[in-house]
Amino acid sequence: MSEQTEWYGNLEAKVETLKAQLGADARDYYLGRFLKIARRIGEFAADCPHCREFQTLMDNMIKDLSYAPTQITKEQKRLFLGNANTILSHLKKTHGLISDGQNTGIFLAIGAGVGVSLGVVFKSPIIGIPAGVALGIVFGAVLDMRARKAGKTI
């Protein structure tokens, strides 16, 4: 087992323990997303010094929450979520990863805009907007599928 896989396995076990301790409040911390981010950080840590630093940070983040999970302050929660977003931002900017479904959402909005334009041209928003939205969803879904196949999703 590689060092990175071992790190992820240990972190996953700690997160599962934390989920059990937090109970229903666990969803407020997006721990599922946290594990997806951790898996990708583990994959890039061998080649990226920032990812190696983030591994230590992620260990500390879970350790801090595990001390007294029922007495977590709003500041601790805000810090946890802020750090997770910082790490996610690094993965997106430095390693070119995208969130699953990101392109679909973006192109849905673009398609709606194009649909409004088509509705004006054809003098019928009933035709233009749904057509634009449909094209946007299809185009975004295709790009998301390509990203998934290329292993570029988080």
Can you annotate each of these PLM segments?
Residues M1-C48:
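N-terminal leader/propeptide segments of preproteins
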Residues K149-I154:
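Short, charged juxtamembrane terminal tails flanking transmembrane helices
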Residues L57-A109, S117, V121:
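Membrane-proximal, non-transmembrane alpha-helical segments
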Residues P49-L57:
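Short, well-ordered alpha-helical segments
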Residues N103-V120, S124, G128, G132-D144:
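Small-residue-enriched transmembrane alpha-helices
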Residues W7, R27, L31-F34, T86, ...:
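N-proximal short alpha-helices
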Residues E12, E16-K19, G23, E43, ...:
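Generic, low-specificity signal for short hydrophobic/alpha-helical stretches with a mild N-terminal bias
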